[in-house]
């Protein structure tokens, strides 16, 4: 079997086991945390809290999470390395850039169409993270991440999507995305990726579980991509029963082999008051799928075989397909 890089080093893809394909550990605005550190508080306590929560997840039967925290979401790999070293859970880390609008100012002058023009420096950065490691940690990214939300394909967002597509073709690392499903943004992403020559079967279109539009989901699948049914617990966007129903319905339509399950949860998110989350979204945590979602899916006719496909087989297949291409 092929190998996949994790925060503790490479593993055989056969050892991924039960995998949640769209999670986070810490999400923060790094400059805010550095200059106004009160909300973050004690580093050791935050790390210990994450170790405990991920340990609970491992004990519940999950073997691997994919941490899709990239530039723009506060990625800091030395912190993730500390967490990974103290838990048996595999953590696959990501590269890419998260924005709904413009690129960070660092990229303003350099790159295609910018004042100083030149090649896309983002692509080279992403490739370095995958092939050589992130900063001086020696930890290599295993997946690429980008986002398209309500503003749509702004110039900055389109630039990131194309850079991610180019890095994917050079490395073979799969792509996973954030989308605004209600506005069918996954189709925009597929169009840009296709223009860049991406094999869309190597792409997970994220947050598809926010939608109950079967036509939209069928269109994404027809183009080849996987559906990320990956926001279980974010009931303020789509309620629990709707999320369960759409997964069950797509399974009925024969698409268990094109879906992955996850929560998009984290141990810390500085954009939301910590006391608010348990009140507004009490199910938004790492254990929700195993505690609540799986039993509900079974009640709706989803079989153990289909659950194994979505939680084990599909993640393995996504990461097994390796190598760059033209």
Swiss-Prot record:
Cofactor details (free text): Binds 2 Zn(2+) ions per subunit.
Q: Which residues does this entry mark as bearing N6-carboxylysine?
A: 145
**Gene Ontology MF term list:** hydrolase activity, acting on ester bonds; zinc ion binding
Biological process annotations from GO: catabolic process
Pfam (any one):
PTE
Cofactor(s) recorded for this entry are: Zn(2+)
**What CDD domains does this protein's entry cite?**
PTE
Question: What family is this protein classified in?
Answer: Belongs to the metallo-dependent hydrolases superfamily. Phosphotriesterase family.
Recite the other comments: Was identified as a high-confidence drug target.
Recorded protein name is: Phosphotriesterase homology protein
Tell me what organism the protein belongs to.
Answer: Mycobacterium tuberculosis (strain ATCC 25618 / H37Rv)
List the lineage, top down: Bacteria, Bacillati, Actinomycetota, Actinomycetes, Mycobacteriales
């Amino acid at each position: 079997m092929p190998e996949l890089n994790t925060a503790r080093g490479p593993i055989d893809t056969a050892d991924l086991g039960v995998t949640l394909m769209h999670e986070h550990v810490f999400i923060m605005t790094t400059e805010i945390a550095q200059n106004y550190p009160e909300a973050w508080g004690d580093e050791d306590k935050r790390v210990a809290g994450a170790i405990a929560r991920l340990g609970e997840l491992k004990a519940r039967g999950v073997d691997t999470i994919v941490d899709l925290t990239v530039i723009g979401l506060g990625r800091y790999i030395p912190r993730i390395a500390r967490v990974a070293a103290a838990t048996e859970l595999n953590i696959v880390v990501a590269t890419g850039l998260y924005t709904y609008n413009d690129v960070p100012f660092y990229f303003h002058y350099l790159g295609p169409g910018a004042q100083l023009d030149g090649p896309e420096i983002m692509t080279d950065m992403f490739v370095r993270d995958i092939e050589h490691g992130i900063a001086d940690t020696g930890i290599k990214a295993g997946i690429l991440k980008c986002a398209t939300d309500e503003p749509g394909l702004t110039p900055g967002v389109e630039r990131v999507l194309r850079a991610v597509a180019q890095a994917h073709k050079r490395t073979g690392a799969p792509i996973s995305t954030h989308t605004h499903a209600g506005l069918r943004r996954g189709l925009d992403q597929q169009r840009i990726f296709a223009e860049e020559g991406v094999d869309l079967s190597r792409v997970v279109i994220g947050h598809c579980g926010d939608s109950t539009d079967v036509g939209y989901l069928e269109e994404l699948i027809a183009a080849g991509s996987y559906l990320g049914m990956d926001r279980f617990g974010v009931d303020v966007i789509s309620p629990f029963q709707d999320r369960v129903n759409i997964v069950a319905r797509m399974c009925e339509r024969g698409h268990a082999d094109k879906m992955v399950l996850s929560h998009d949860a984290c141990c810390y998110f500085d954009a939301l008051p910590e006391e608010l989350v348990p009140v507004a979204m009490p199910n938004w945590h790492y254990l929700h799928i195993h505690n609540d979602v799986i039993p509900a899916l079974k009640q709706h006719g989803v079989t153990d075989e289909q659950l194994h496909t979505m939680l084990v087989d599909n993640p393995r297949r996504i990461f097994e397909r390796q190598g760059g291409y033209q």
